[in-house]
Structure formats: structure tokens, C-alpha cells
Amino acid sequence: MSAFEIEHLASCITAHAWNADRSRVALCPNNNEVHIYAKQGTSWVVEHVLAEHDQLVTSIDWAPKTNRILTSSQDRNAYVWTFKDGQWKPVLVLLRINRAATHVKWSPQENKFAVATGAKLVCICFFEEEHDWWASNHIKKHKSTVLKVDWHPNNLLLATSSSDYKVRVFDAYIKKADGRSVTRPYGEVAFGEPVFEFDQCASWVHALKWSPSGSTLAYSSHDGVFAVANFSTNPPTIEKLRVRNLPLRDLLYITENSIAGVGYDCAPLLITNQNGWKYSGEMDKASEGGAAAGSETSARKLFQNKVDLGESKSADKKLTTVHQNCITSIVPFKSVGGVVSDFSTSGLDGNIVVWHVKALEAKNKFKVI
């Protein structure tokens, strides 16, 4: 079995998301549109084009239970798309922001969602039945652009990463969405007040992700710092690791003790918990049939060659990795009980790659734990 399957669907992909049965994928080809591809035989063909946004689409999330697509854009808007009568119908979300929407995420129960923004705030959005629209409450404790958001499995806590170098955890309880009978993990915290705030990074915090159990929160920043906050203690303990690779743009828990990271190195890397979090190597050391990777990462080698040799001697050389440019997102493709057996990545090279974890383990001699 091949370690990966690759599809070239655009000249550049900035975000992608799958539907529940993985028969369709929604992606942004680096413009104001979202293209929905469907598998027909051995080929992927464009089935729908969502073109309501005016500027670059920054994020896509496809709810598996309700089959609703959530999109955000630099045009300061977010839309909830519902499939009806053979067409995707958009509903504008009332965000009330004056800067770009940077990232969106449905809550686990899909009764609300979070929108990160460049307006130094996060919108917690919920559906108001009496008005038939998606309204929002604002969390305003950030000092700069919010880059990523991620929901805790309990549907109440929300983690945010920001360009003010901090990671924050908020109680995002909304009475109209969550009801009155829920048990809030940290008591009656006022909406918008951070429960925890972490400042171990010295640069933009690009990515963060909760573990499947919600007991740990991993995040990474532009200065090469990777950290994990362990919430089994109170206050949480922080374990920090500085990876030698280029900065990570996105993270994914493969298991509770194994995390895949992607970014400017053009290859997924693995970090595992072996009595402490440690860098375990690249999951894509070289493409099948390609030259073996050296001691340096492929992306760093390419840029160094450009400096040493000039553009004409390196510009037309292919990287030894599957992706040929920065990887912008990583999402689970197949998972059972919090264990991911397959995951997909998309990048600025226009490729979507589905990776098979067991085949990667056999090929590259590493172990997911």
C-alpha cells in the first residue's frame, strides 16, 4: 500500500475541508471562491462553486452531522451554507467586525461556532430562532489578530492563538445554544474572561489543537516553539520544545500521545510523548521514487541553494517531499475513537494529499504511540 495519495486540484490551496463520508472536499483555490469537488470514478470534478465572498477565503469547516459548510474571508464576513434543492444556499452571519475573519470552527455539537478575526476579538456565533439568523457575542481580550481557534470536546471551552504571542482558554458558554442544564468545568466564569492564559512563546502563535480527550492542548509559534499544556493538573503544566524545523502552521493529534505538525518545511513531522514530548522526525522523509532527503529539511535546503547558487541553478529543482510548497492545513481523513489512521494535508502547491499512517510508519521507520 502506498503511503499517500495525491491530487492536484488547483494552482494553490489555502484551506480545505471534507464532508462526513469523505466523498466530497471543499477547498479555496487562493481566491474568493470555495470549490466543492466530488469523486467520479478515479477523478475529482468540480460539483459546485460557492462565490458569495468578495475577497480571499481564509478558512472552511464542514459540519459532519448537519452537513453545513462554514466559510470566512478577508471581506470581514462569514457564511453558513446549507444544501437545499440541489444548491448550496448561503446565510450571512452577523459578525459586527471591521477587520478580516481569519479562521472558523464548528463546536463539537455543531450548535455554535467560533470565528477568529483581525479585529482583536473572537465571535461566538449561535442561531437565534426568533430572528432566523446567526448572531454573535464577542470575546475581546486579545491585543492583536487572532489566528486560530479550537473547541474543547466538552463543547464549552474555546482555545485561541494570537499574534500577540499568547494562547488563551475561554469559557464560551452561550445560554441560548447550550441551555441551562450544562455543567461548566470552571464554574460561573463571566463570558469573555480567560480561564487560562499562556505566554511561553516569543512570536505569533500560528496553530493550536486540543487532544481527543481534552486533557492537553498543543500549540506552536513562529519562533519554532512547540508547547503542550496539560490540564490534568491545576493550574495546567506547560512542556515546551523547540523544534529545529521551520515554523508549523497547523497541528493534528494522531493519538493522545502523537501529534503531526505541518508548515513551511513542506512535510508533516511527528512529535510524540515518550516520558516527555520529543521530536520524532519527518513523516515524509522523501517522496516515493525521489532522492533521499539529507540531514537538512527539503525546504531549508532549497532556500539555501538559492542563496548559494542563484535562482537559475535551483528554481527548477523539485523538492524531495510530496508537497512542493508550504503546507497550510492538516485535517483527519479517517479516525476511530480519537485515533487517526489517515489524514489529509493541503498546500500552496495546489495539492491535497491523503496520508496513511501505518504505511508511513513502515516506510519511514517511525512509531506513532
Swiss-Prot record:
Pfam name, any one: WD40
The encoding gene: arcA
Each WD repeat, start to end: 8-47, 52-91, 141-180, 200-239, 322-365
Family: Belongs to the WD repeat ARPC1 family.
GO cellular component: Arp2/3 protein complex; cell cortex; cell leading edge; cell projection; clathrin-coated pit; cortical actin cytoskeleton; cytosol; extracellular matrix
PROSITE patterns: WD_REPEATS_2 (PS50082), WD_REPEATS_REGION (PS50294)
Role summary: Functions as a component of the Arp2/3 complex which is involved in regulation of actin polymerization and together with an activating nucleation-promoting factor (NPF) mediates the formation of branched actin networks. Seems to contact the pointed end of the daughter actin filament. The Arp2/3 complex is involved in organizing the actin system in cell motility and chemotaxis, in phagocytosis and macropinocytosis, at late steps of endosome processing, and in mitosis.
Record bears the keyword Repeat: yes
Keywords of the record: Actin-binding, Cell projection, Cytoplasm, Cytoskeleton, Repeat, WD repeat
Organism expressing this protein natively: Dictyostelium discoideum
Repeat among keywords: yes
GO terms of biological process kind: actin filament polymerization; actin nucleation; Arp2/3 complex-mediated actin nucleation; exocytosis; phagocytosis
PANTHER family linked: ACTIN-RELATED PROTEIN 2/3 COMPLEX SUBUNIT 1, ACTIN-RELATED PROTEIN 2_3 COMPLEX SUBUNIT
GO molecular function, one term: actin filament binding
Name of the protein in question: Actin-related protein 2/3 complex subunit 1
Annotated compartments: Cytoplasm, Cytoskeleton; Cell projection; Cytoplasm, Cytosol; Cytoplasm, Cell cortex
Quaternary structure and partners: Component of the Arp2/3 complex composed of arpB/Arp2, arpC/Arp3, arcA/p41-arc, arcB/p34-arc, arcC/p21-arc, arcD/p20-arc and arcE/p16-arc. Interacts with carmil (via the region between the LRR domain and COOH-terminal proline-rich domain); carmil is required for Arp2/3-dependent actin nucleation. Arp2/3 complex, MyoB, MyoC, and the alpha and beta subunits of capping protein all form a larger complex with carmil.
Chief location category: cytoplasm
